[in-house]
């Protein structure tokens, strides 16, 4: 993390919610944050988003969760204190923190403005800072202390409760489309899956001036996709006639389903010459990769994970300008365990946001 290299004063008392071990039992966890340094911003957390990633981290699915674990990589709040050299923010500003709270700042990726691909990142929930050895704890807590570089300005006309999930779902789909030039009017983009990521992807595509076609496993969400989210068309992925008619018509396809579930051949067949498949769903297994469609159509497959700081801010500003928010159920902290079970059972439309400011009690 950019900033001081002296020993930190970890004396800011904090409380968050998370897990003490991989059992998945959620509970209040008391811990300490650092005293704000000269370039730090102290934030009173008001809302924290919850998604499937948090549930998997709580249970240590990938084997790198550090306990005690306080989750939260979608955080919105207000500034309550700033360091002496902070230039971007003042007390009272609405702000946000995404998936990252630090990076090396020196590598090619960081220098290119893509801090999310830094080989030594400081993630918001559970990293150890390279220089100081400080643990990071997520935003599902009463307070955060973050280097100003990694604090985002929150647009005034964007509601924090409905917008906080954009810090994950929004940037995950915005970044690859922006990178590939699919943010231009007239582009035809297919969206596989209509969950938290897919529903937001459709909203961004329409705001870009593009055509959005949702591809799903059943017609259950057809009315919702078209009437609520503005999709131009809806296709069932087993309808061979519909798929045949769409072959070679799309500039891009964004796959928001868990990686490997959607046949790659199906997605590649929908693409125009020079089209791209964007993988943003975490892969659960290996998948077959047909080479002929790639070679004969100069098609490409890219993966993407969140976005750099510049992209984060651009995404929030764009969302505010076009009134893009996530379909969100706002809950109190006491409902968190139930919310996690509902996420596991796919029983949420489409995101949860915890009202931290009004429901997380902090006692010295």
UniProtKB/Swiss-Prot annotation:
Protein name, UniProt field: Geissoschizine synthase
Residues that bind NADP(+): 52, 194, 196-197, 216-218, 221, 261, 280, 282, 304, 306, 351
Subunit structure: Homodimer.
Record keywords: Alkaloid metabolism, Metal-binding, NADP, Oxidoreductase, Zinc
Summary of the tissues where the protein is detected: Expressed in leaf epidermis.
Co-factor binding details: Binds 2 Zn(2+) ions per subunit.
SMART domains: PKS_ER (SM00829)
MF (Gene Ontology): geissoschizine dehydrogenase activity; oxidoreductase activity, acting on the CH-OH group of donors, NAD or NADP as acceptor; zinc ion binding
Residues at which Zn(2+) 2 binds: 104, 107, 110, 118
Protein purpose: Component of the seco-iridoid and derivatives monoterpenoid indole alkaloids (MIAs, e.g. catharanthine, tabersonine, vincadifformine, vindoline, vincristine, quinine and strychnine) biosynthesis pathway. During the conversion of strictosidine aglycone to geissoschizine, catalyzes iminium reduction on 4,21-dehydrogeissoschizine to produce 19E-geissoschizine, precursor of catharanthine and tabersonine derivatives. May also trigger the production of reactive intermediate used by the HL1, HL2, HL3 and HL4 to form catharanthine, vincadifformine and tabersonine.
Top-level enzyme category: oxidoreductase
Reaction catalysed by this enzyme: (19E)-geissoschizine + NADP(+) = 4,21-dehydrogeissoschizine + NADPH
Keyword check for Oxidoreductase: yes
GO biological process: indole alkaloid metabolic process; response to jasmonic acid; response to silver ion
Phenotype reported upon loss of the gene: Accumulation of ajmalicine at the expense of catharanthine and vindoline production. Lower tabersonine-forming activity.
CDD domains in alphabetical order: CAD1
Record's keyword annotation contains Oxidoreductase: yes
Outcome, altering residue 53 to T: Abolished activity
Gene3D superfamilies: Medium-chain alcohol dehydrogenases, catalytic domain, NAD(P)-binding Rossmann-like Domain
E.C. no: 1.3.1.36
Expression induction: Induced by methyl jasmonate (MeJA, MJ) and silver nitrate (AgNO(3)).
Classification via PANTHER family: ALDEHYDE REDUCTASE
Pathway: Alkaloid biosynthesis
Consequence of substituting residue 73 to M: Abolished activity
Binding locations of Zn(2+) 1: 51, 73-74, 168
Family of this protein: Belongs to the zinc-containing alcohol dehydrogenase family. Class-III subfamily.
